[in-house]
Amino acid sequence: MKQDTNGSDNPKILALCGTFGMGGIEKMLLNLLQAGMSFDACADIPDHGDLEEEMQKCGCQTFHLTRRSQNFIKHHIDLYRIIRDGKYSIVWLNSQNAFFMWLHILTARAAGAKKIVVHSHNTRDWRAKDKNRLSRMFRHILYQSADICLACGKEAALWLFGTDQNVQIVPLPIDTNHLMVTDKKRSCARQTLCLEGRQVFLQVGRFDPVKRQDYTLRVFEKIHEVKQNAVLIFAGDGQEKQKILDMAKQMGLLSSVRFPGNVKDMSLYYAAADAVFLPSLYEGFPTVLLEAQAAGVFCLTSETIDHTINRTGLVRFLKANEKQIDAWTVAALSAKGLSEDDRIKANRRIAQEYNAETIAFRLEKLFL
């Protein structure tokens, strides 16, 4: 579906997201654009992000709002003008706080938006506790105010709307073809990253207390006692990165832990990995676990994650507390790369539900 800038046939869509960084929502939007869906996008903050240029290459016009914490009123005036001047008839909100999304709905309606789509991607607001309370207070109001309610999973629906009734569960789209791992691709990836003959562990995501890279590092410390040639890769950036780097140094693990920063194309790292860690305090329906399964990689994740994300049998759920570090260690050490046939089977299983072209087509039908 191509947007009609004159507003005649196909309505114009504006997608709102937190940033244009490397998060799951942003990757979802990019995957949909690359699959042929057409929309423009607006970030909640003025900062430019790592995926913004890639989105623009797909024909997506990008906008930025004044940071809400700096000027609350200007934040909403910016949004009003973007919607009004751009003549966007559909506004697609992607966030995790019912109160702030409701305020965006009021602004969008005032600016002329005809249809509001609210899309839940998480199971709580990772910010201050008072924001969580506000979100709970406004869940029913948000639910009643939206024209279409979407969620990446049942738990995400319950968090944002307080119900999963009349909420469309829309899986996160990924590029499954790009994530297919043959023996040749795995060998080339390990050679390129200088990882031949080593057991490779990977965690993908922003450095934030919610993601618990510190827990992964404590697990890896135990792994390293058994396998000195093991390697841990933290792909991502964020406020906690220096803290984790210092922690690795204090543990004497710095030579075995890599920090490549934000990686636009993770397929090389998934192809090289033996296991992916995700010990998060909470997530919605994490794209990382879908991508890892599509690449045929064993996954270790928190019990708090929606268990329905295990579509291939490759995901193991464990409690992520101090008493369970040994259990994580044993499970990680048992992780071995799958055969090429099994990786292909896993990829095809994920592609049945989560291929970007399929999700893009479904969303277009829902929006119109």
Question: Residue ranges of each PLM-predicted region?
Answer:
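N-terminal strand-loop element at the rim of the active site
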Residues: 2, 10, 15-78, 239-240, ...
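A conserved mid-protein helix/loop that constitutes part of the nucleotide-sugar donor-binding site
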Residues: 23-31, 199-222, 239-245
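Acidic anion/phosphate-binding donor-loop and adjacent secondary structure
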Residues: 70, 74, 158-161, 173-192, ...
